Amino acid sequence: MISTTDYPTVETTTTAEELYAEYISAPASSMSPAAIAEHLQQNQITFEIPSAHDLRHIDALNSFNALLQRIGNAAVSYDPAPPSGWSPDGSISTEQLSKSVVLDLADLRDRSEESGESSWWSQIFGDADMHVIINYLWIGVVSSLVILSLVFILFSCYFYRKFRTWKKCNKDIRAQIHAASDSYSSHLVGCDASRLLLHQQMQHPHHRSSEAGFYQIESPPCYTIATGLPSYDEALHHQPRHFAYGMKFVYPSLAAVHHHHHCISNWEKQEPLNKLQKCKLSAAAAVEEDKADSSSSTSASASPSSSESSNLATATPAICINMPSGRQDEEVDNSDSDSAIAVAVAVAQSLQPAAPADDDCASLVVVVAA
């Protein structure tokens, strides 16, 4: 609001007519100029000029007042028993609207302030201290983390126990299958496999029965990382089918160079049966020519030519190569796998230090241990 004076507004109960009459009745001689000025200052009338914003606000209130009057009159006209305090003709007066809660601006302002103070924060926590609230929040967060950690640990222990049970069960089943059919071996550490073995014995005593029993073992749990991956023994079992061209898996393998005196001693024992000496003469062409001459000559000259060829053979140095016979190769090819493994283990236990580079008896031996 715009004010025309800086003096404070003085509230008085006297009207303008009374002040004017008092001023006229007082004689001019009885009042000094200071008293007259003080009297005028005390009885000064001030007024305020409304601004454009105030005028728009007043117009809006008048429009809203008229709207409420129309709505109220329409509602009261349909009500046969109007409430007390209404006019006899059933219309809403301006005084009633001014006294209502809707147009009481002071009441609306107080309500807005109260609603601002009574927010959702104050409704939930009330007058609690902020430090106490933060402490409670931290306690809740830590408690939730502890509970989640305990649940995770319990589930981890449960799944690990199930995995160990499955592993132990498969180990016992594979051990019993290996003892029954000697087809599979396991490197895993009870589980009752009597029903599985009984079902296996009722089938045909063939290699396929042990294979079927092997594949009836419980599969890995779905929560392990080994799902879908074959075991080492299973991979070795299927190896000949997928790699039928001589590819072979050996585990573990040991390669060492050692002295050959053990093999030489065994070789010398069976020398008359397992060895064949083949000698080649350096002058083979001359021998063939002598044989051709001896065949074309007479029987009289046969003895001198034969003696001459024998003398040539004795005069020429022979190169002899020791080679194993074909019988030994057949025996090695037809030997049993168990005896070969036993011999390999025996040779592995009797390994000697490596022979020097110029040793003719040194050989490379690859030992395969099951």
From Swiss-Prot:
Stretches the record annotates as Disordered: 287-312
Alphabetical UniProt keywords: Cell membrane, Cytoplasmic vesicle, Developmental protein, Membrane, Transmembrane, Transmembrane helix, Ubl conjugation
One GO MF term attached to the UniProt entry: Roundabout binding
Leader sequence residues: none
Cytoplasmic topological intervals: 158-370
Predominant location category: membrane
A Pfam family the protein falls into: Comm
Cell compartments where the protein resides: Cytoplasmic vesicle membrane; Cell membrane
TM ranges: 137-157
Family as reported in the entry's similarity comment: Belongs to the commissureless family.
Record comment regarding domains: The cytoplasmic domain is required for function in axon guidance.
Protein name: Protein commissureless 1
Protein's organism: Drosophila melanogaster
Designated gene of the protein: comm
